[in-house]
Amino acid sequence: MALTQMALDSLDFDATVALAEKVAPHVDILEIGTPCIKHNGIKLLETLRAKFPNNKILVDLKTMDAGFYEAEPFYKAGADITTVLGVADLGTIKGVIDAANKYGKKAQIDLINVGDKAARTKEVAKLGAHIIGVHTGLDQQAAGQTPFADLATVTGLNLGLEVSVAGGVKPATVAQVKDAGATIIVAGAAIYGAADPAAAAAEITGLAK
């Protein structure tokens, strides 16, 4: 069984809240995407936290420096998970992990553009990372890349960490990523691009369970 996560990627504050209202009953985790949080700020997190107390909320900060300093306000405001880039300095990554631990929350290390994903996963596991994010970005997807080979690499390490997979996941690939060991399955366009986002979210969650 895997958890499902919906990526909220719109820059429009009200549209983001409206979409969250449709999909929140059908997913486990609401993700505030990087452009979305940069554009709308911590107020959006506070709004979603108040409206959706039963969902986990991930804020995709993609922290690259000043780990503890950047992440702490978001944990304090109600984030359950924030992200830090795997290409960041280990001290930065440790700072985000420390901030998460201070609030009883989780830090996700995003492996986007990490060269040796197995080696970095082992390093951050030693630091106490909670979740590894296997992430094929939008620009990489446009070039035809997928996260599936990298997912197999990371889950094959058997480090006991949660593993999130993002990048072009749709109903037809949910079984594949679940069988490959993903514990969190992230869908964005497959939900928000659907004619009925609530139904699309429910379908993906049904396949993930």
Curated annotation (Swiss-Prot):
Coiled-coil portions: none
Top enzyme category: lyase
GO biological process: 'de novo' pyrimidine nucleobase biosynthetic process; formaldehyde assimilation via ribulose monophosphate cycle; L-ascorbic acid catabolic process; one-carbon metabolic process
Gene3D superfamilies for this protein: Aldolase class I (3.20.20.70)
Keywords, comma-separated and alphabetical: Carbohydrate metabolism, Lyase, One-carbon metabolism
Pathway noted in the entry: One-carbon metabolism; formaldehyde assimilation via RuMP pathway; D-fructose 6-phosphate from D-ribulose 5-phosphate and formaldehyde: step 1/2
NCBIfam families associated with the record: RuMP_HxlA
Its biological purpose: Catalyzes the condensation of ribulose 5-phosphate with formaldehyde to form 3-hexulose 6-phosphate.
PANTHER family xrefs: 3-KETO-L-GULONATE-6-PHOSPHATE DECARBOXYLASE SGBH-RELATED
Family as reported in the entry's similarity comment: Belongs to the HPS/KGPDC family. HPS subfamily.
UniProt name for this protein: 3-hexulose-6-phosphate synthase
